[in-house]
């Protein structure tokens, strides 16, 4: 087989494992970023890789680069995927992304089929590995004449327990803005056969302790819209369908207070355009009578709700740790959300030697053909290499490696369906699961627990 070549768009933290897996397989990779510096940094010392500067908004430049390669990987923000896919359709080249298929991408399905190309999506961790093991159990149960009555799927990218040493029990390996914005999303899911909707401001109040292993104090809350999964996973019989997020205990209560006091608002505020002391910014955001810590705290306590006095103390201490009552100058970003993000990113980074953790678990409540009931779980618990050791974070590995394996399989014809795809059937999924398990040790452990 002639040497294949791939155009990889993006240089974010998940791109390195993808680059390594592909170049180790002898595939040539052109690393393309807006800035040449970022592309050079990612490809430094990697055989078979070439850095270039590319603006995906420039159709002519994008088409010219796509034309030189067999496949394009889009690891840039999902809002650009449709632009990339359109270019690939024009040039008749395959595409792989790790993002959810958006309506704008799905609209290109017929054009992709007509061009004879595969546009493979949702093949990272979540979405990605989660689909592989959800479909596996669902297809097995259906083949045996059983029914899936409940499907719960929770995933969290977290600091390892020993590194969860701040009031949120959370650290940022990428933009904190995206993490915080997700906490304002409304959620929809099936409960007892009915669609349940939760408004964005109420999301954190719905978080509940969630048992996976005794050694972890997780809480879980629903993620955006789980209702399409009745159809996507072909489980019309399911009464309960929830896909959600895992965090450590204490996280939702802390975030809920930030919401209550106006810190997650992205409304422009003139006073947040200058580097004023945090206590003055906080006084104005919470509308306290003065910038003294006492006045600010009493305003926060009266505007937010707390489950107990003990929790109130913990959260107020956490806000103090963040520095929002202090004389320290803010990094002005024009609104409360982004100004807070600047401080979170400064105080809540992973430090040298710390590790991240990814936990993913599906829980299936099954009614067997004979009417008996059982509960099965599929669980993945992965720790990253310590920061600074040169290894991958758990999150980077679990997004980047499945992406690379999908690229290899599209190039060699193992994945041969055309159009806009996601891993939703065993024909696509079985080879991916086999390769991920046998070659990279990536698998969900399956158990019958009740």
From Swiss-Prot:
UniProt keyword Ribonucleoprotein present: no
Result, substituting residue 398 to F: In strain: 4091-5-8
GO biological process: lysine biosynthetic process via aminoadipic acid
Pathway connected to this protein: Amino-acid biosynthesis; L-lysine biosynthesis via AAA pathway; L-lysine from L-alpha-aminoadipate (fungal route): step 2/3
Chain sites annotated for binding L-saccharopine: 99-100, 126, 224, 245-247
Top-level taxon of the source organism: Eukaryota
Species name: Pyricularia oryzae (strain 70-15 / ATCC MYA-4617 / FGSC 8958) (Rice blast fungus)
Residues given in the record as NADP(+) binding sites: 11-14, 33-35, 55-56, 76, 98-99, 125-127, 175
Subunit structure: Homodimer.
A GO MF label: saccharopine dehydrogenase (NADP+, L-glutamate-forming) activity
GO cellular component, one term: cytoplasm
Protein name: Saccharopine dehydrogenase [NADP(+), L-glutamate-forming]
Protein family according to the UniProt entry: Belongs to the saccharopine dehydrogenase family.
Top enzyme class: oxidoreductase
Membrane-crossing residue ranges in chain numbering: none
Keyword annotations of the record: Amino-acid biosynthesis, Lysine biosynthesis, NADP, Oxidoreductase
EC number(s) stated in the UniProt entry for this protein: 1.5.1.10
Catalyses which reaction(s): L-saccharopine + NADP(+) + H2O = (S)-2-amino-6-oxohexanoate + L-glutamate + NADPH + H(+)
